Amino acid sequence: MSDIALTVSVLALVAVVGLWIGNIKVRGVGFGIGGVLFGGIIVGHFVDQAGMTLSGDMLHFIQEFGLILFVYTIGIQVGPGFFASLRVSGLRLNLFAVLIVIMGGLVTAILHKIFAIPLPVVLGIFSGAVTNTPALGAGQQILRDLGTPVDLVDQMGMSYAMAYPFGICGILLTMWLMRLIFRVNVEAEAQKHESSLANGHSLIQTMNIRVENPNLNNMAIQDVPILNSDKIICSRLKRDDTLMVPSPGTIIQAGDLLHLVGQSTDLHNAQLVIGKEVDTSLSTRGTDLRVERVVVTNEKVLGKRIRDLHFKERYDVVISRLNRAGVELVATSDASLQFGDILNLVGRPASIDAVANVVGNAQQKLQQVQMLPVFIGIGLGVLLGSIPLFVPGFPVALKLGLAGGPLIIALILGRIGSIGKLYWFMPPSANLALRELGIVLFLAVVGLKSGGNFVNTLTQGEGLSWIGYGIFITAIPLITVGLLARIFAKMNYLTLCGMLAGSMTDPPALAFANNLHATSGAAALSYATVYPLVMFLRIITPQLLAVIFWGIG
C-alpha cells in the first residue's frame, strides 16, 4: 500500500473511532467533535507501536487545510451578526466574555514564568483548557514561523489533549457551582428573561393603534414624522370593515386602525403621538390580503436598497420585517438586500407573487453552494494571514496566520453578503458539513502526531502536572467572572451560562445550558452574542503569547 493510501486509511479510521467516542454521552454531556482528538491519540499510539510510517507532508497539508475550512465556515456563519454583537445591546456580555479571555491569557503567562513550562507545552495547555481548537492551530503556526523544532511543536497537541477533558468538565462544574452558590430557581430565571425581552429593545414587536389625534386627520402617512421614519413600519390600515396596505401617500383619518411594526420603545412613542392601543384584530383572514414570507435569491436585487425597489408604489406590498441570519429586523427603506434574507410581505396575493418573482424566492437555490466565492474567500484569507506585520522589539513579524486570516476575511464577507453576482451565503447544512469535515481532519492529524508519546507522557512524564495547570487556566477565569457577573451585574443565570459557554466556544457546554430549561432561549442568545468576538480573540491570544514570550525569553 502506498504512503498516501495508508495515510488516508488511517485518517478514516481515526475519524470513525473519534466520532464514535464523541457520541458517547454521560448525563447528556460528551466530547462531541473533540472525541476525534482522542481517537487520533488511540490510533496514533498503535501506529507508533506497529512501526508504520505515514506521509508527513500529506498530514501537514491535511491539518492546515482542515483548520482553514473550519475557521472560514465559522466566519461565514457568524459574520452577519458579528458586528451587531459589538453594539450596545451585547456590549455587557462581550465585556465579560473578553475578561474571561484576558484572564485566561494572564493565568497562562503566570504559569509559564513561575513553573518554566516550555512555550509549546503551555500554549497547548491553554488551547485545551479553553477547548478551542483554532487556538491550537494558530499557536502551532506561529511557533513554526518562529523556527521552533517540529518535535516541540507537536508537543503542543499532546498538552492540548491533556488539558481538554477538564476544559469541558470545568465549565459545566462552574455552571453547577453558580447555581449552588446563588440558590438559583431556573424556572424563575427563565420567566425573568422572557419579561426582560418583552420590555427590552431587542425584539421586533407589533401594535394596533386607533388614530385619535385630531391633528393627524386627513394627513398622508408620509407627512407624519413618526410613521415616515425607519423605526416604524405601517403594514396594514383598517377603515371601517376594509383592510388595506397603506402607501406613503395614503390619507389617514380619525378612527383608522394602524398595524405598526417596530421595537417596543418606538411603538410606545408612536402610540403617544397617534392615539390609543387597541386589541382589535387586523388579521388578513377573510380579506383579500395575505401575509407571506419570501426569500431573496435573485442576484439582480442583491445589494439594492428596499426604497430603490419601490415595492409599495409598484405592487402595493409592504415589507413589514426582514430576517437576516436568524435575526428579526425592521425593514427600513435604507436596508440593502442580501442573499438568503427572508422578507415578511403584506399585500394582495397577485401582488405578493409579483414581488416574490422580483426577489427570487427560489427555495432550491438556498440548498446550492457557489463554490467560486468559497475559494475566493479562502484564497484572500490565506493571503491576509501571510502578510507580515513588523512590530519593533519582536524577533519575527506577527501574522494572522492560517487561522486568523481566513476568519477575518470570512467575517467581512459574511457581513457584506454579496458583491455583484457573487454571494457568500452558504446553506446551513453545507456550512456545517464543511466545518465538521475541517475540524475532523485537523483533530485527526493532531491526535495522530500526539499519540506516539501520549501514554508515556501521562504515566511517566509531566502529563499530570499539565492537567493541573489546565485546571487553573479553565477554572480561575470562569469562576471569577461568573461571580462578578452575578453579584455586580445581576446577570440572569441562564444568560450567564450561555455567556460562559460562548466564552469557551464550547458547544457541549451550550447543550448543557440549553437543557437547564427546555423552552428558554436565553443561553443560546447570549452564546451567539459573544461567540464571534471570542472566537477571534481565542485565535489571536496564543499568537500574542508566543511572540511576547519568545521575545523576552
Curated annotation (Swiss-Prot):
Coiled coil: none
Localization, UniProt: Cell membrane
Domain RCK C-terminal: 192-276, 279-361
Alphabetically ordered keywords of this record: Cell membrane, Membrane, Repeat, Transmembrane, Transmembrane helix, Transport
Transmembrane region(s): 4-24, 28-48, 65-85, 95-115, 158-178, 371-391, 403-425, 437-457, 464-484, 533-553
Membrane disposition: Multi-pass membrane protein
GO CC annotation: plasma membrane
Gene Ontology terms describing biological process: potassium ion transport
PROSITE patterns according to UniProt: RCK_C
Single GO molecular function: monoatomic cation transmembrane transporter activity
Family (UniProt): Belongs to the AAE transporter (TC 2.A.81) family. YidE subfamily.
Record protein name field: Putative transport protein YidE
Organism annotation: Salmonella arizonae (strain ATCC BAA-731 / CDC346-86 / RSK2980)
